[in-house]
Amino acid sequence: NWYFENIDRSIKNKDLKNYISELQYGNENISGSKNYWNESSLKISAIEQVKLLMKIDNQQLKFDENYINAVKDSITLKKANQYRYLGKTGTGIINGKETNGWFIGTIEKNGKSYYFATHLDGKNNASGKKAKDISEKILEEMELMQ
């Protein structure tokens, strides 16, 4: 997260609004705190996250391919002979409790991309790590991580 937070801090607010709009990222509202993406004003659904991953893969965004590849490299969790596994977790914390966990990603295998998003919502222990663990169990059952 520190990597993406540092990039975020280096971008002017006007430019950031333009990027968020270009991505059509959720409700596009970054008016909240400096951590607008973490239990604040910016909201996005699991379906919207998956659609964004698909747009990135299908080069439907006006961003330089080198930047797209840099982001994909930064979220690559595993490269194996048979597949490439990309993903990003997130955990929303309210009053010290993990109330919102998510994990989104892609498996690239045999020339195809498989997109997924897992979202957990609860009073406590709804972390990105738990969402990732659930996702990986499902992906393994589907034999996509072999």
Describe the predicted segments one by one.
Residues 4-58:
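Mid-domain, small-residue-enriched loop/turn segments at the edges of structured enzyme/sensor domains
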